[in-house]
């Protein structure tokens, strides 16, 4: 069903770890409006879609969201790699995450609340599901906030 290419859609190269920024970006991975929820939403809703074209589109979008999830995971990983104890102690935003997950990439919101399927919906009603998709995509705009409000002087990645 899926073909996996062993490369990211866009390269992620972050030279300097930044655990404070990682504490914000992690919401794009497993927060209520993050990529994990988006991919599960689309891939679940496709089964009850009565039109082949819409079913195919939901499959394509859900698969694309999995790719986005992988890029966010790479960003979080690179922002937290090789942290010293001092780095963690000096970043109160990242310290609670570190207690439970060290530098593992775990699907959670910046608040620390773990990802849950309770933040997505698949009703079986095509109109309700597509309406929910539109609302969720609007909410995903929040994910640009950490990127737009932070400078990445030692990094290169495209956020599209």
Regions found by a protein language model. Name each.
Residues 1-160:
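Non-heme di-metal
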